[in-house]
């Protein structure tokens, strides 16, 4: 059985092409467990999670990447945020009926993919591509060609393992400033495309790589764990409350007696009463309950 929730980087020594392989199960379950999403929405979040994990592994600096789908369809928002430590969180917003067999375009409607790269130090970069491809992988490949002009292929699979949702994916990318022939890259992509969902989700990573590339010279690096981690906190909620007009905050307090701030990512609730609000206004952080 594979070790899920790990990302593996590898390098083709003879082609100056790098690769990544990731499988997720527990991380995906934690993202889904606080929501009653229809199955097609779960599938999209699984694909987004895999894609974000693969993309964050391409970062050469500390920071995070957000991959977001937006549109006018019944799923008008789906987003996964992850950082270079492979800590992930995500959420979707559903505002209409979802057909059981809805594909990506049916879910999102007229929309686009937004990729936001936020370094720990330096300026944020945002790229936007129209939802023109039939799959998320195709849209992201288009993004790479437009933004980084690096030949890139993504292969994403979703399914179940032992009755629990799981997903996996692989990325191939030509190394920057290398003279890899397109035919060589296409050859590796053709090999990778043969991966079956069952193989990717149930076999150890080294066996998957051997099955695909046993005739190539491949260096495999130590894996990196992938995990769910939400960055919400009582302090961040307090900071958000500072940005609201006092009249609005006082109105909620008068009506409800307290303010309940809910994190869509993890389901946590943070409650603030009148005394807490007074402390916030005095620039004092409210004590954790």
From Swiss-Prot:
Gene3D superfamilies: helix hairpin bin, Hsp33 domain, HSP33 redox switch-like. The keyword Transferase does not apply. One of its GO terms (molecular function) is protein folding chaperone. Keywords: Chaperone, Cytoplasm, Disulfide bond, Redox-active center, Zinc. One of its GO terms (biological process) is protein refolding. One of its GO terms (cellular component) is cytoplasm. It is found in: Cytoplasm. Its main location: cytoplasm. PANTHER family: 33 KDA CHAPERONIN. Redox regulated molecular chaperone. Protects both thermally unfolding and oxidatively damaged proteins from irreversible aggregation. Plays an important role in the bacterial defense system toward oxidative stress. This is 33 kDa chaperonin. It comes from Shigella flexneri.
């Amino acid at each position: 059985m594979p070790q899920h929730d790990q990302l593996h980087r590898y390098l083709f020594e003879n082609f100056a092409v790098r690769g990544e392989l990731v499988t997720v199960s527990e991380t995906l379950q934690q993202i889904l467990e606080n929501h009653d999403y229809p199955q097609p929405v779960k599938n999209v979040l699984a694909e987004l999670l895999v894609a974000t994990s693969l993309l964050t592994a391409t970062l050469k600096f500390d920071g995070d990447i957000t991959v977001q789908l937006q549109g006018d369809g019944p799923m008008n928002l789906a987003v996964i945020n992850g950082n270079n430590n492979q800590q992930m969180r995500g959420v979707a917003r559903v505002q209409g009926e979802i057909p059981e067999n809805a594909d990506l375009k049916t879910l999102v409607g007229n929309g686009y993919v937004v990729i936001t790269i936020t370094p720990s130090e330096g300026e944020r970069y945002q790229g936007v591509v129209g939802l023109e491809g039939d799959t998320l992988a195709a849209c992201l490949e288009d993004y790479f060609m437009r933004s980084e002009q690096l030949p890139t292929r993504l292969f994403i699979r979703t399914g179940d393992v032992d009755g629990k949702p799981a997903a996996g994916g692989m990325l191939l990318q030509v190394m920057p400033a290398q003279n890899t022939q397109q035919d060589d890259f296409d050859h590796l992509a053709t090999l990778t495309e043969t991966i079956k969902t069952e193989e990717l989700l149930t076999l150890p990573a080294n066996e998957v790589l051997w099955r695909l590339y046993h005739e190539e010279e491949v260096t495999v690096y130590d894996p990196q764990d992938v995990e769910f981690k939400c960055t919400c906190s009582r302090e961040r909620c307090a900071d958000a409350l500072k940005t609201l007009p006092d009249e609005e905050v006082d109105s909620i307090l008068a009506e409800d007696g307290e303010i309940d701030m809910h994190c869509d990512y993890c389901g946590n609730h943070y409650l603030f009463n009148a005394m807490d609000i007074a402390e916030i206004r005095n620039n004092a952080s409210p004590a954790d309950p």
